Amino acid sequence: MLLYNSKSYVLQLIFITLLLTQLNKVKSTSSTLTGFTFPNFWSNTQENGTEIIFLGNATYTPGALRLTRIGEDGIPLKSNAGQASYSRPVFLWDSTGHVASFYTSFSFIVRSIDVPHITADGFAFFLAPVDSSVKDYGGCLGLFRYKTATDPSKNQVVAVEFDTWPNTEWSDLRYPHIGINVNSTVSVATTRWDNDDAYVTKSTAHITYDATSKIITVLLTYDNGRHYQLSHVVDLPKILPERVRIGFSGGTGFNETQYILSWSFTSTLNSTKISALTQKLRSSASYSSM
């Protein structure tokens, strides 16, 4: 749901400070499995491709990861898809019963030549098998094939999508939305996304997975105080392999491209820390709507 209040900007600053403090505590524990922070994408590390892998039409551009193509004139192009992912496999679970919890945060902006009338299709943060590849463009967001997009038995991916175009042919929602997707383009949980802000200002997303409760929680925030939240139970070990690839996948049907401006990720076997982060996410959303 959309939550907005004139005082929420200050409250969100307080929340983010507390959240980062808690995140640093998670990173400092011996149970941390994977942890990285890209405060921006200006450095040579990202430019040389040592930390980020690009597939399809995704590429590095000074200051950002661009997921889909633009023309020589800088205008986003139709009908293409791309992925930018972390270069190392990420541990998710093992046969002894260990399951990782994780927290990720990233900022992004969407560009289009025809806002807000015709723009499509969006992008997603995803977890998939290490050997997965870029698939179809448009509403498939590079994660699915059109012929099997709604068949969970044919797919293996969990994603949080930022969908700028409602694909009604899949019985999808009839408005832009944020969704949690499990092996299908049809989301298992959604919230309406009044996404005009995404085209003119930076968006910041926070996503947690609590291995104990098996809940994925999503919070999207804007500097103007707007924010959106949703959550859903997803049993990741029943869906994904022990080690996965994580990253971003975007697709276009109309003229749009998506830029990832910053990205941090940490996973841990200490689900208590992630539970605390999740509670802060939910508390922030509830408090700033008062």
Curated annotation (Swiss-Prot):
PANTHER family: CONCANAVALIN A-LIKE LECTIN FAMILY PROTEIN, LEGUME LECTIN DOMAIN-CONTAINING PROTEIN. Keywords: Antiviral protein, Calcium, Glycoprotein, Lectin, Manganese, Metal-binding, Plant defense, Signal. Disulfide bonds: none annotated. Displays strong antiviral activity against herpes simplex virus type 1 (MIC=3.1 ug/ml) and weaker activity against the rabies virus (MIC=20 ug/ml). Mn(2+) binds at residues 161, 163, 172, 177. The keyword Signal applies. It comes from the Eukaryota. PROSITE patterns: LECTIN_LEGUME_ALPHA, LECTIN_LEGUME_BETA. This is Lectin. GO terms for biological process: defense response; regulation of defense response to virus. Glycans are attached at residues 48, 57, 183, 255, 270. N-acetyl-D-galactosamine specific lectin. Displays antiviral activity and therefore may contribute to defense against infections. InterPro entries: ConA-like_dom_sf (IPR013320), L-lectin (IPR016363), Lectin_LegA_CS (IPR000985), Lectin_legB_Mn/Ca_BS (IPR019825), Legume_lectin_dom (IPR001220), Leguminous_Lectin (IPR050258). GO terms for molecular function: carbohydrate binding; metal ion binding. SUPFAM superfamilies: Concanavalin A-like lectins/glucanases. Belongs to the leguminous lectin family. Ca(2+) binds at residues 163, 165, 167, 172. Residues 1-28 form the signal peptide. The keyword Calcium applies.
